[in-house]
């Protein structure tokens, strides 16, 4: 399901959200929460509004891109009618294709995110910067709830050496590094200097740059250069799907007893469920899902978090 976001700068976010809910109530189903968050549900799609420091965020979703553009237009036009005392700028991100098996109800999504540990200013700024710099590719960034899960799992694993295969702009790197002990180290693998150059600044701001060792180049080469023994306590795989089976094998053989490997996008937008989908990535991930379920070296669970997350724990 395609979606698009906009951040509106204002010192009166609650006022604008209340006005939108009140004014659009005659043509849409609206819900205003006690914490100032709101959902506007139109026939063509939905828009969730969330107060943030310095303004508010709008997240529009719809079944198709044309409908999404309509939702954005309706909400923007109504919002600007109220801006008589200041000039509001509503800059929507490009529509991001729905690479998830299903989209959560905005009410459920909003409730879920509200009841996770709150996102901080560094991660919030990184989300905005990623959207500005990468456009439609911003959909590759992990969500706040998934990032919170990574921090918790990394901390629970007790890992001193962690691996990340696929860095993008560094959001997940921050989350993992924050879960490591002070002497912990994250070996982060990616092939893009452009996207990881964004990451470095935010690693510094988050105070975790000294824990992250970025390796630019094919991840398989980096993994195979590691000692062929149990040295890794935590790993996160979120890179090219065609290579998932190879990444998993190189990682799992190096996991310490009790170590965790987490794999993102194991649903591939629901395409792994249907064997009619047979491109290289779909075949690779579908096959790996079966492999992990039967792998006696690990105990695993697959969770319906966003586009599917598998957590496997090394036994023995």
Question: Model-found features: residue ranges?
Answer:
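Short glycine-/aliphatic-rich beta-strand segments at the starts of folded cytosolic domains
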Residues: 1-19
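Short beta-strand-to-loop capping motifs
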Residues: 8-10, 60-63, 114-119, 314
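Short, intrinsically disordered, mixed-charge
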Residues: 22-29, 73-84, 294
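N-terminal intrinsically disordered, cationic/polar leader segments
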Residues: 25-31, 37, 43-46, 50-63, ...
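C-terminal structural segments of small proteins and small subunits
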Residues: 60-99
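N-terminal auxiliary segments of SAM/dcSAM-dependent transferases
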Residues: 93-123
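Conserved SAM-binding loop and adjacent beta-strand
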Residues: 101-102, 116-120, 135-149, 155
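S-adenosylmethionine/decaboxylated-SAM
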Residues: 144-316
């Amino acid at each position: 399901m395609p979606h698009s976001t906009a951040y509106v700068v204002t010192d009166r976010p609650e006022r604008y959200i209340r006005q939108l809910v009140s004014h659009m109530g005659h043509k849409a189903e609206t819900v205003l929460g006690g914490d100032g968050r709101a959902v506007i549900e139109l026939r063509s799609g939905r828009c969730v509004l969330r107060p943030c420091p310095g303004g508010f965020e709008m997240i529009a979703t719809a079944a198709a891109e044309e409908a999404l553009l309509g939702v954005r237009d309706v909400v923007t036009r109504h919002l600007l009618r109220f801006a008589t005392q200041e000039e509001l700028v509503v800059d929507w991100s490009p529509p991001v294709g729905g690479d998830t098996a299903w989209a959560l109800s905005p009410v459920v999504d909003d409730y879920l995110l509200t009841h996770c540990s709150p996102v901080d200013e560094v991660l919030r700024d990184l989300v905005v910067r990623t959207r500005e710099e990468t456009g439609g590719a911003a959909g590759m960034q992990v969500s706040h709830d998934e990032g919170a899960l990574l921090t918790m799992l990394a901390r629970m694993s007790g890992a001193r050496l962690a691996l990340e295969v696929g860095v993008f702009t560094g959001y997940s790197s921050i989350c993992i590094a924050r879960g490591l002990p002070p002497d912990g180290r994250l070996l982060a693998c990616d092939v893009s200097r452009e996207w990881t150059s964004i990451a470095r600044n935010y690693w510094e701001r988050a105070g975790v740059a000294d824990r992250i060792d970025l390796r630019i180049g094919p991840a398989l080469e980096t993994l195979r250069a590691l000692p062929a023994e149990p040295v890794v306590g935590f790993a996160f795989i979120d890179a090219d799907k065609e290579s998932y089976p190879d990444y998993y094998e190189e990682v799992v053989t190096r996991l310490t007893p009790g170590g965790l490997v987490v794999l993102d996008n194991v649903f591939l937008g629901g395409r792994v469920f249907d064997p009619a989908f047979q491109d290289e990535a779909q075949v690779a991930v579908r096959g790996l899902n079966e492999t992990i379920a039967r792998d006696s070296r690990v105990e695993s669970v697959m969770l319906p978090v966003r586009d599917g997350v598998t957590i496997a724990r090394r036994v023995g």
